[in-house]
Regions:
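Trp/Gly-enriched beta-strand surface patches
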Residues: 1-54
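Non-catalytic terminal regions with compositionally biased, polar/charged low complexity
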Residues: 56-72, 76-252
Length: 252
């Protein structure tokens, strides 16, 4: 498919419907490919080889020189006949800065989702934010239902305002054990709350001049000198970066 306009792809599995709304158009995608991938991953038996294929949606962009492409898609699972999403559109897709913003409309509210790579103050619709990630839900009368800011310092929309002293804090690591980072210096009691996120520096990059890859973890618990994360064991690293965040929910 040639994406002259945004496309919506719909699947149905048993009683569950699923929409994939690809918001990119020809300015950032040359073509959309619908393909069946093998349903098996290791052909250890004939029954494995007979596993039904997995349908995939591929967005493709080509150029003779290095390029940057940013994709935006809204994924909507639902069990009703009609999707709860009325419309979705891409408000910003700046390849130079990496800033992206999406507006998703429902019958009774509108969500604004903002992703950036810096702390520049930007405005999309009724939302002004400085941070790497922000989400705001607004009702049909313009009242803010809830707002969330991650790794940022400021978010404002109507009567809702969030301010953080700093977007992130870097902590030096003394050692690691299973799912726990042990810190060189103590932290304040509320600096690493349950459910917050941190980034851990990975191995050296494959090419010089590139940043080290980082892995994100969700915090399960913390003491003054340690942070334990959920689900996965941690790896040796010299430092971790706490991503500060705040969520507010307003009564309507």
């Amino acid at each position: 498919l040639v994406p002259f306009k945004p496309h919506t792809f719909t699947w149905q599995f048993r009683k569950i419907n699923y929409d994939l709304m690809l918001l990119n158009t020809l300015d950032s995608v040359d073509r959309i490919i619908i393909a069946d991938a093998p349903g098996w991953r290791r052909g250890s038996s004939m029954s494995a080889l007979e596993t039904p294929p997995i349908q995939q949606i591929l967005a493709e962009k080509r150029a003779d020189k290095p390029l940057t492409t940013q994709y935006a898609a809204v994924m909507v699972p639902y069990m009703t006949e009609k999707s709860p999403v009325v419309s979705a559109r891409l408000l910003e897709n700046d390849f130079r800065t990496g800033a992206m913003a999406v507006e998703v409309r429902f019958e009774n509210r509108t969500d604004y989702i903002i992703s950036t790579r810096d702390q520049q103050l930007r405005t999309y619709g009724p939302v002004t934010a400085a941070g790497q990630f922000a989400v705001v839900s607004v009702n049909n009368q313009g009242g803010v239902l809830q707002a969330y800011l991650l790794a940022g310092t400021e978010l404002a929309c109507g009567q809702a305002k969030i301010t953080l002293a700093a977007p992130q804090t870097t902590l030096r690591v003394a050692s690691v054990t299973e799912r726990t980072f042990r810190l060189i210096e103590p932290i304040l009691p509320d600096m690493a709350p349950v459910g917050a996120y941190l980034l851990a520096n990975g191995p050296e990059p494959l090419r010089k001049g590139l940043p080290s890859p980082r892995t994100g973890f969700e915090i399960e618990s913390a003491t003054a000198v340690s942070i334990t994360v959920r689900d996965y064991p941690v790896f040796d690293c010299d430092e971790v970066t706490l991503l500060h965040s705040k969520h507010v929910k307003l009564e309507q």
